[in-house]
Amino acid sequence: MSRFLSRVAYACGTFGHDFFYAMIGTYFMIFVTSNLFNTNDTSYNEYMIGLVTTVILVIRVAELFIDPFIGNTIDKTKTRWGKFKPWVLSGAVIAAVTLAILFTDIGGLAETSPIMYLIVFAILYIIMDIFYSAKDVAIWSMIPALSFDSREREITATYARIGSVFGGQLVTIIVIPIVLAFSENSNGGAGDATGWFAFAAIGGLIATVGAIILGIGTKEHDSALRENKTDTSFGQVFSVLMKNDQLLWIAFAYLIFGLGQNLINNFNLYYFI
C-alpha cells in the first residue's frame, strides 16, 4: 500500500469525522429551535429548548470525565484489525444511526409525551456521544501507529488536518441546500422535518464511508514503544493535566477558537433563514 493512498484514506476519515462533528456542534440545535420546537406556543418552545440544551450541557460536562476511560479502553484493545480501527468503524456507524434518530421527533414523542421524549433523547444522545468520543480518540491517536517514520507521521497529520478542515467547513455550504432539497415545505428557508432528517442521514453516511475508507486504506503497525506497560488511573491523568500549564493554555486557546467558530456559523445561518 503506497504512502500517498494511506494519507488520502486517513484524510477521508477525518473529513467525515469533522463533517459529523459540525452536525452535532452547530446544526442539531438549529434543527431543535427552527423545526422541532417551533409551535405557536412560545413558552412551551422556550421551555423544551431550555431542557434539551440543559441535557446536552450536562452530558458534555460528564464527557470530560468519561474520555480518559474511553482512551484507556482503546489503549487495551487488541484485534486482528488493530487497536484503533474497530473503534473508528463501530463509532462511525453507531453515532450515525443515533444522530439520524435524534434529528426527528422520535416517533412523535416530542409532541405527545415531552417527558418521555427527553428521557429517550438523553439515552440516545449519551450513546451517540460515547461512540463519537471513542471514534474521536481513536482516529486522532492512530497516527503514530501508521508509520515509524516521524516525517511520514507529520505529513499524514497534515493531510488529516486538511481533510478535517474541509469536512467541518463544507457543512456550512451544503446544509441548507440539502435540507431544502428534501423538504416538502420550505418553511421560510428553514426546511421541514423530512429535510433535516435527510441531512442527518447523508451526513452520517459521509462519516461512515470516510471511516470505511480509512479502515481499508490504512495499516496499523505494532511497536513495543507504543505499548502501555502500566495502568494509569483517572486521578493520575487529571493530576498531570492540571500541572501542565502549557497544555492548559493550548486548551484554553482552542476553547476560544471553538466558541468563535461556532458562534459565527450559528449566527450566519440564523441570519439568512
Segments the model singles out, each with a brief description of its role:
Residues 1-273:
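Membrane-embedded alpha-helical bundles of multi-pass transporters/translocases
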